[in-house]
Each structure stands twice: as structure tokens, then as C-alpha cells.
Amino acid sequence: MKKKVMAALSAVVLAFSASACIGNVSAADKTVQTVENTAKEEVSYSLSNQDASKEAEELYGYICETFGNAIISGQQESTWMGSDQYEFDYIYKKTGKYPAIRGLDYMNDDFKGVNERAADWHKRGGIVTICWHCGCDFSGSWDECMKTELDDWDKALTEGTPEYKKLIAGMDKAAEALKELKKQNIPVLWRPFHELDGGWFWWSKGGAENFKKLWIIMYDRYTNHHKLDNLIWVFGYSGNNRDYDKWYPGDEYIDIIGADSYSDGANEKLYRSVEKIADGKMPICFHECGRIPTVKQLKEGKADWVWFMTWHTEYITDGNNVDDLKNIYNDEYVITLDELPNFTKTK
């Protein structure tokens, strides 16, 4: 059974204040002015983990209230450009603003470094999202995502087999890292097995049925065995498929649904496709993009993505017009780091 979070959405202006609540979830300290709401006036959303932490509830509640009223800015980091602040310094230099969400990656077994940067971003008041590029042994880099493949999906997904034990041992690497963030009361938008339907990463090469089993195994392992109550589960489609329903494991394993695309514009057709799967039960995010859609494009396309996250390095520095970037980050519809509620306040 899912934990209920109510989001009562206003028609024109959504005010987040210390006294405002979403169900039993405190919304925020800072008032944020947003524009016309295209969502329903009252929507019931649910957290999949019945025992989710207070911090996860608060973050999820904020995202639910934002959905349909504004878009949260996000940026994926790189760590090989001379500074782990490369993209963030660039955005601030060009716009005077920082993104609200920092995207991180446990790739190359960088659990310690990612956790340190996640904790720092959280202390700055930001939102943390983590993905995991890895091979089928849950180690390595982006290349291993593409080049490796499970030898026998049936054995790997059958409890008690040596292959299953190996799968679980690999999966547990990130669980241990996420426990360290849990100890610090840091909620995480956890985005595993992204671009799940694309066919290029090992986790999608076994087909939809095997993928769904894999997702459920991780969800159960992390939620029920490791008691990771700080995770908000983000289910991320690619933009290259329209047969989305067959990959969907069920509402009880997902908190936020989304897709990515490196095509210009609001990608409203992609949004509509994902919206059908969401069926009004959860927010929808643009979990990766190249060129950020303008606010005009989002409004005209009625694409109510709750956040965007630009990919790293040249995707932000070369792929986005500086004037557009400045306009986007300074538009009242776009939430930046300085406009987030105080998620780090003493509970």
C-alpha cells in the first residue's frame, strides 16, 4: 500500500509557506510565485514506501505541489573538467542563478565522492538526484552499461541461484552508499536503470518482462531489506520508444515517472505518452535533456514537466544559447536553488 500525499493546487498562484501542508507534510518556508496552473485543482499522489522518512515526505510533497505550477531547474554534474562545480559555476556566471537539483552518478564506484558532493549540495539547500551507470556486475563506467550483458536472465532473477546472489551483491554496493545519505537525513531522487526501454544499456537487453523483475528486486531489496526510507523512486523512460506500458512494473514501485530527450523544444508528444502511463497518479519529470525548453515552449505545448535536468559538459555550455539560458533561469516559472524551501532546517 502506498503512503498518501495530498496536493491541493491553486489556480494561479501557489504559495509555499511554513504553515502550508501537503497532507501531513510541511511544504516550505519561502513563498514562490508561479504562473497559470494546468493541473487539476486537487490531486492525490502517493509515496510508494509506506515508511518513508519525514525528509522524503517533505521533498515529495514539495514536488507534488510544484507539478503543474512551475518547473524545477536541474543540472547533471561532471567530475573531469578540472572542477566538480564546472557546470554549476558556468550557469551561475551566465545567469546569476544556480540550479535547484544536482544530478550525480555512482559510475566508476564513486560512492564516497558522490556522497560528499550530495551532502554538500544538500547543505546548500539543494535537491539531490542520483543515477548509476554501471556494468551488469554493478561496477565500471558508461562503457560497461553498453558492453556487458547478463548471461542468463532466468538464473540471475531466480532467488537462491549463484547468479542471483551475484546480482544482489552488486546491487548492494549502492545500497550501502545510500545508507550513508540516510544517516545524514538526505532524501534522494533515486533514478536507477534509466532509459530503461532504450535497448542500449544491459538492463533493457533482456526485454520488458525481465526488466520489470529486475526493478522490483531492487525496489524490494532497498526498501524492505535495507530500509532505505530516504529514497524517492524515479522511473525514467528514454525518448526513443512509444510502447511504454509493457515496461511499467506497477504504481507500487514508483514515485515519479519521466522520460528524457535530446531533441529541442518542450517534447510535448513525449510528455503526453508518459502522462498516459502516469494516469494522474504521480508527477512527471524531464529527467535528462540537452537544450532546455523555453518557458514559452513549455506553456504552448502544455508540457508540465516538474523538473528538467540538463546533461553535463558541452550539453550545457555549447548546447544552450546564453540568452535563452539567462531568460530560463530568471523566469518566475523556473525554480532555482535560491527559491527552494529550507529542506535542511532543524526538524
Explain the meaning of each model-derived region.
Residues K2-N24:
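Sec-dependent N-terminal signal peptides of Gram-positive bacterial secreted proteins and lipoproteins
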Residues K30-D105, V295-Q297, K345:
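N-terminal module-boundary/linker segments of secreted carbohydrate-active enzymes
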Residues E57-L59, S83-I91, K112-E116, K173-A177, ...:
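Alpha-helical scaffolding within the catalytic cores
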Residues C64-E65, F88-K97, G113-I127, L178-N185, ...:
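Acidic (Asp/Glu)-rich catalytic clusters
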Residues F67-S78, M282-K347:
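Substrate-binding cleft of secreted/luminal carbohydrate-active enzymes
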Residues G74-Q76, R191-F193, W215-R242, K281-I292:
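Aromatic-lined carbohydrate-recognition surfaces of secreted/lumenal glycan-active proteins
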Residues F111-I217, L228:
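Substrate-binding cleft of extracellular glycoside hydrolase catalytic domains
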Residues Y244-G265, M309-W311:
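Aromatic- and acid-rich polysaccharide-binding/catalytic face
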